[in-house]
């Protein structure tokens, strides 16, 4: 059994997830070998003789298919979605294009690979405020709302330090929800209300700044939300578990992003959703491991 803390911008979240997993794994079932990755080569050197990799990784390199592909080459089964799905979901620009093709609502956006490509006419079509975010990344690291062109340019310079590609997205002001999926089945929907204007990194991991609770949406909206979340899961080839983050405005769910390795800390959303379905944290880990082994076996491991 292998647990991982990573080396990307979300290393601290990975460590928190790993610690939570260690605390709740059944020691009678699993031999737990915690391994910390400080650089890419650590994976090949430290993963020898491991029967299964339970990934406590988030963000670039951990959630983008890099680790998954390496483990596949080494013949080591692992938790969560495969390399293809992980890489697609981590790339916001590509995943949004696929969702648009599938008829799923997602905020209008433009992608930049360098500052010189910034088109003011395209910005005017989107209209301020806008959300600026790294094309690859999670936990809302490097994400900010901007209200004018000066703020935009300043933020772009900052985000380009995080990533070589940047997404500029139309800001949708609505009710924030998240939909967790476990083995293709939907768990209870969780709403997110927070003091901060945007559910950024600090808000996600600060229990005092947010109110997260299981909700029952009106029937018609719930049907739309469920359809959108499952369409995302299937279209992006997710497996085992995932979390789909949405904003609901005027009864329409807009998909913000899909997480193939959602947070598993004490304050994370998927464990809260699972608990509302009667699934304890320990049972959730068992289900993730068992389902992952089944999926990897079907993939040829």
From Swiss-Prot:
Top-level division of the source organism's lineage: Bacteria
One Gene Ontology term of the molecular function aspect: metal ion binding
Note describing how the cofactor binds: Binds 2 magnesium or manganese ions per subunit.
Catalysis performed (reactions): 2 D-alanine + ATP = D-alanyl-D-alanine + ADP + phosphate + H(+)
Pfam families assigned to the protein according to its UniProt record, in alphabetical order: Dala_Dala_lig_C (PF07478), Dala_Dala_lig_N (PF01820)
Binding site for Mg(2+) 2: 257, 259
Cellular compartment(s): Cytoplasm
Residues binding Mg(2+) 1: 245, 257
Keywords in alphabetical order: ATP-binding, Cell shape, Cell wall biogenesis/degradation, Cytoplasm, Ligase, Magnesium, Manganese, Metal-binding, Nucleotide-binding, Peptidoglycan synthesis
GO biological process terms held by the UniProt record: cell wall organization; peptidoglycan biosynthetic process; regulation of cell shape
Start and end residues of each ATP-grasp domain: 96-290
UniProt pathway annotation: Cell wall biogenesis; peptidoglycan biosynthesis
One annotated Gene Ontology cellular component of this protein: cytoplasm
Function: Cell wall formation.
HAMAP family: Dala_Dala_lig
Similarity-based family: Belongs to the D-alanine--D-alanine ligase family.
Protein name (Swiss-Prot/TrEMBL): D-alanine--D-alanine ligase A
Higher taxonomy: Bacteria, Bacillati, Bacillota, Bacilli, Bacillales
């Amino acid at each position: 059994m292998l647990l991982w803390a990573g080396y990307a911008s979300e290393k601290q979240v990975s460590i928190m997830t790993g610690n939570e997993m260690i605390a709740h794994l059944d020691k009678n079932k699993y031999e737990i070998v915690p391994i910390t990755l400080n650089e890419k080569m650590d994976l090949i050197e430290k993963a020898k003789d491991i029967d299964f990799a339970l990934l406590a990784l988030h963000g670039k390199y951990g959630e983008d298919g890099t680790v998954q592909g390496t483990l596949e080459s080494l013949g080591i089964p692992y938790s969560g979605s495969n390399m293809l799905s992980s890489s697609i979901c981590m790339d916001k620009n590509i995943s949004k294009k696929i969702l648009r093709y599938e008829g799923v609502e997602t905020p209008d956006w433009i992608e930049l690979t360098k500052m010189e490509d910034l088109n003011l006419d395209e910005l005017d079509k989107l209209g301020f405020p806008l959300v600026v975010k790294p094309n690859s990344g999670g936990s809302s690291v490097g994400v900010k709302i901007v209200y004018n062109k000066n703020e935009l340019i300043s933020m772009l310079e900052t985000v380009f330090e995080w990533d070589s590609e940047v997404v500029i997205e139309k800001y949708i002001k609505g009710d924030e929800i998240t939909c967790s999926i476990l083995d293709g089945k939907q768990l209870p929907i969780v709403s997110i209300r927070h003091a901060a204007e945007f559910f950024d990194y600090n808000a996600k991991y600060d229990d005092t700044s947010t109110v997260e609770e299981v909700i029952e949406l009106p029937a018609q909206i719930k049907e739309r939300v469920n359809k959108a979340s499952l369409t995302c899961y299937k279209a992006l080839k997710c497996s085992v578990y995932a979390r789909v983050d949405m904003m609901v405005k005027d009864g329409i769910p807009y998909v913000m992003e899909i997480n193939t390795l959602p947070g598993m800390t004490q304050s994370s959303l998927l464990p809260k959703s699972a608990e509302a379905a009667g699934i304890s944290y320990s049972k959730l880990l068992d289900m993730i491991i068992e389902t992952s082994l089944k999926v990897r076996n079907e993939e040829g491991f």
